[in-house]
């Protein structure tokens, strides 16, 4: 319990201490055509998460796997993320650094995708040497999935907490207490940021954003834990379950990249076509969109947990995930129809209230 308290305190104090420093060095987010917030907001959520995570590691050092490699990796991501938040680094440079860290994870930590489980039938789909290449691309993909989903207040924090909670539950169920406690500690380290990001309890005056530094750190940590828990002998979680745990960020990223490429745009060019933007455009408030998307993510994670608990065939879980994926893509590509339907339902609800 002491390590959990120190984790929360370290993360919270970092937000307080770094706030004036961020304003002084220009580490702030300014409103533009994509960002509709009021005023400049400090981009210090990543530093807070790093310090909170570091506090937990220092207190539980002997219980955690490959601490030097993990802490080095997230420190590099934090530094590059802060530079990107301040100066806008090329996405190709960021992807290159992420690839190098993935290679170090494979080479020094022996952490990589060796198999995909029984997603195609009653046999294990082993990847062999191609799994090393897939691991690099998967690492870059997951990092950027959580980076891209960070578009409205609370969303990145909420979805991250859902993923870490699901992982923690499955690790606890399997008796992997070190991984379970770390997963729950990660939630604790996110909470101070999430509270201030949502204006709890100090109001919008003390709002902070996660920034690329934080979102990339979260994405790397999730792929790190998922690889540790889905690969190797006696793995406590099936690979297909990982898809359900990170379903919303992963599917949203793939759907958005597909839509951008289809329109002849760069897949790296930011826009306002993510699911949270479409929900706000349909008439929901940003808080309502945050709660709805987080709820859907929790439902997806629960499906993954239940699949593990009741030993549902992995191929059936994989088919279910693909159905979810195509429903999501259909909704994104037909967003104008859904937007019109939501607005019509809201008008009817208002008329019924008046009546």
Curated annotation (Swiss-Prot):
Entry's localization field: Cell inner membrane
Listed EC numbers: 2.7.8.33
Group of enzyme by EC: transferase
Catalyses which reaction(s): di-trans,octa-cis-undecaprenyl phosphate + UDP-N-acetyl-alpha-D-glucosamine = N-acetyl-alpha-D-glucosaminyl-di-trans,octa-cis-undecaprenyl diphosphate + UMP
One GO BP: cell wall organization
Pathway linked to the protein: Bacterial outer membrane biogenesis; LPS O-antigen biosynthesis
Species of the source: Haemophilus influenzae (strain ATCC 51907 / DSM 11121 / KW20 / Rd)
A cellular component annotation (GO) from this entry: Gram-negative-bacterium-type cell wall
Summary of the function given for this chain in its UniProt record: Catalyzes the transfer of the GlcNAc-1-phosphate moiety from UDP-GlcNAc onto the carrier lipid undecaprenyl phosphate (C55-P), yielding GlcNAc-pyrophosphoryl-undecaprenyl (GlcNAc-PP-C55).
One Pfam family matching this protein: Glycos_transf_4
Keyword Cell membrane: yes
InterPro entries on file: ECA_WecA-rel, Glycosyl_transferase_4, PNAcMuramoyl-5peptid_Trfase_CS
The family this protein is said to belong to: Belongs to the glycosyltransferase 4 family. WecA subfamily.
Source species taxonomy: Bacteria, Pseudomonadati, Pseudomonadota, Gammaproteobacteria, Pasteurellales
HAMAP family recorded: WecA_Gammaproteo
Entry's Gene Ontology molecular function annotations: glycosyltransferase activity; magnesium ion binding; manganese ion binding; phosphotransferase activity, for other substituted phosphate groups; UDP-N-acetylglucosamine-undecaprenyl-phosphate N-acetylglucosaminephosphotransferase activity
Ranges in a coiled coil: none
Membrane spanning residue stretches: 1-21, 39-59, 63-83, 123-143, 182-202, 208-228, 237-257, 315-335
Name the record gives this protein: Undecaprenyl-phosphate alpha-N-acetylglucosaminyl 1-phosphate transferase
Signal peptide: none
The organism's place on the tree of life at top rank: Bacteria
Cofactor list: Mg(2+); Mn(2+)
């Amino acid at each position: 319990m002491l390590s959990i308290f120190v984790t929360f305190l370290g993360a919270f104090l970092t937000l307080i201490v770094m706030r004036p420093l961020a304003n002084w060095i220009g580490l702030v987010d300014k409103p533009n055509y994509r960002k509709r917030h009021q005023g400049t907001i400090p981009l210090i959520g990543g530093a807070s998460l790093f310090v909170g995570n570091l506090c937990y590691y220092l207190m539980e050092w002997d219980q955690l796997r490959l601490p030097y490699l993990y802490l080095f990796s997230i420190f590099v991501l934090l530094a590059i993320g802060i530079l990107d938040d301040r100066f806008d680094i090329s996405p190709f440079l960021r992807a290159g650094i992420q690839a190098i860290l993935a290679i170090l994870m494979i080479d020094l930590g022996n952490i990589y995708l060796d198999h995909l489980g029984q997603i195609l039938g009653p046999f294990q789909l082993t990847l062999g040497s191609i799994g090393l290449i897939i691991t690099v691309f998967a690492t870059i993909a997951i990092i950027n999935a959580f980076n891209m989903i960070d578009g409205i207040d609370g969303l990145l924090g909420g979805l991250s907490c859902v993923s870490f909670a699901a992982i923690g539950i499955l690790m606890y169920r399997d008796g992997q207490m070190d991984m379970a406690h770390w997963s729950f500690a990660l939630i604790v380290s996110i909470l101070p940021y999430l509270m201030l990001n949502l204006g709890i309890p100090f109001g919008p005056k003390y709002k902070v954003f996660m920034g690329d530094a934080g979102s990339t750190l979260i994405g790397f940590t999730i792929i790190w834990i998922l690889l540790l828990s889905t690969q190797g002998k006696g793995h406590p979680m099936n690979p297909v379950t990982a898809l359900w745990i990170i379903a919303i960020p992963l599917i949203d990223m793939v759907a958005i990249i597909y839509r951008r490429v289809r329109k002849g745009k760069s897949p790296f060019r930011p826009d306002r076509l993510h699911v949270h933007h479409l929900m706000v455009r349909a008439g929901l408030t940003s808080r309502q969109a945050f709660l709805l998307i987080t709820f859907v993510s929790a439902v997806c994670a629960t499906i993954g947990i239940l699949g593990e608990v009741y030993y549902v065939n992995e191929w059936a879980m994989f088919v279910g995930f693909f159905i979810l994926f195509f429903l999501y893509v259909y909704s994104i590509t037909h967003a104008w129809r859904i937007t019109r339907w939501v607005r019509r339902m809201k008008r009817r609800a208002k008329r019924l209230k008046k009546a």
